[in-house]
């Protein structure tokens, strides 16, 4: 089920504080966050946010098309190594 429209988008308070500081200054360092559940807001456009994927922080540059999505959608958590090769096909 989706979130109720009357509640508005969710974003962690500590992330909003970091975004306000980064957007007011001219610092281009990525903002580190573990908050994959936060919704991308219009204030995030043009910033680079390093989203944790369980192992490392993946840098995500926020564009206009990403507004409304969650940060976790852009930091993939699973690595696909490929299916096992078929031994019969190799012969």
From Swiss-Prot:
It comes from the Bacteria. Protein S19 forms a complex with S13 that binds strongly to the 16S ribosomal RNA. It holds the Pfam family Ribosomal_S19. Belongs to the universal ribosomal protein uS19 family. The gene is rpsS. InterPro entries: Ribosomal_uS19, Ribosomal_uS19_bac-type, Ribosomal_uS19_CS, Ribosomal_uS19_SF. GO terms for molecular function: rRNA binding; structural constituent of ribosome. Gene3D superfamilies: 30s Ribosomal Protein S19, Chain A. One of its GO terms (biological process) is ribosomal small subunit assembly. One of its GO terms (cellular component) is cytoplasm. Keywords: Ribonucleoprotein, Ribosomal protein, RNA-binding, rRNA-binding. Signal peptide: none annotated. It comes from Cupriavidus necator (strain ATCC 17699 / DSM 428 / KCTC 22496 / NCIMB 10442 / H16 / Stanier 337) (Ralstonia eutropha). This is Small ribosomal subunit protein uS19.
């Amino acid at each position: 089920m989706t979130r109720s429209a009357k509640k508005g988008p969710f974003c962690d308070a500590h992330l909003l504080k970091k975004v306000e500081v980064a957007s007011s200054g001219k610092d281009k360092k990525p903002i580190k966050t573990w908050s994959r559940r936060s919704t991308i807001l219009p204030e995030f456009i043009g910033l680079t946010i390093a989203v944790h994927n369980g192992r490392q922080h993946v840098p995500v540059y926020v564009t206009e098309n990403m507004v409304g999505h969650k940060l976790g959608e852009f930091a993939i958590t699973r690595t696909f190594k490929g299916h096992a090769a078929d031994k019969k096909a190799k012969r």
